[in-house]
Amino acid sequence: MAESSSPSPTEEIVRLIKRLSAYVAFKMSSLFSTTSIRNLDSRSIGAIAGLAIAVIFTWRAIRTPGEQRQRRQPKRRIHNAETSSAAAAASQSNLASSVAPEVSSPREDNAVQDVVDQFFQPVKPTLGQIVRQKLSEGRKVTCRLLGVILEETSPEELQKQATVRSSVLEVLLEITKYSDLYLMERVLDDESEAKVLQALENAGVFTSGGLVKDKVLFCSTEIGRTSFVRQLEPDWHIDTNPEISTQLARFIKYQLHVATVKPERTAPNVFTSQSIEQFFGSV
């Protein structure tokens, strides 16, 4: 039993245009009769002519794409056949001419990976770079001696001896490269002052070129050390006395408070570390 196929949209449009054409032809034949022509004006004739032209162009617009598709289909088929055959020939030639790739050994892969890892490994900054970064381009630094540069922690101990901490020498050298460094301390007598200068000279502090004996200042009271700092107006001051750090916080841009235990309250511009070596990352 044959199945009835529904007409396509194009066929329906063609039928509609044919009916419209027949209707227009009938109307035109009746209008152009001898009795009707006399009653027509120029507007009616123009409307009829426009309708006829519209029907003709609509018919050509519907008919032309179908004919063009029918004419172009063989070319597409031929082009697709040529393309597929060319692709097949190219793939066969590639398979025929290709040589089995060399397989790298695990040792070679590991060696290449090691080179890549070493190349992209982050570079560790030098001590000089760390000092300069921590000081924030500070051009002048003041620092007390007891408990920071010297092993001794009180003026009474300086009456017996003065010992420079060996671990601080490298940091001192880097600080003197970038900043104007002043050392200061409270002493009880002239003999203590001489012992301190001799200890610094024996440690090679004055031979580096950045520090001279004239930049080592002595006083007899803690207030005297505070006055030194206020007069010099450094960018950084390093001290172990929390009271002095608190007093100078309003006047000095940055301070480093050296202490084993961090104070409960410190100003925002006061940093705390167990030693200057630890603060600058040299230990």
Swiss-Prot record:
The modification N-acetylalanine is found at residue 2. It is found in: Peroxisome membrane. The chain crosses the membrane at residues 45-62. It is a single-pass membrane protein. Residues 81-100 have a biased composition (Low complexity). Its main location: membrane. Keywords: Acetylation, Membrane, Peroxisome, Peroxisome biogenesis, Protein transport, Transmembrane, Transmembrane helix, Transport. Pfam families: HAD_Pex22. Residues 66-107 are annotated as: Disordered. GO terms for cellular component: peroxisomal membrane. GO terms for biological process: peroxisome organization; protein transport. The keyword Transmembrane helix applies. May be tethered PEX4 to the peroxisome membrane and may be involved in a late step of the matrix protein import. Does not play a role in the biogenesis of the peroxisomal membrane. Belongs to the peroxin-22 family. Interacts with PEX4. PANTHER family: PEROXISOME BIOGENESIS PROTEIN 22. This is Peroxisome biogenesis protein 22. The gene is PEX22.
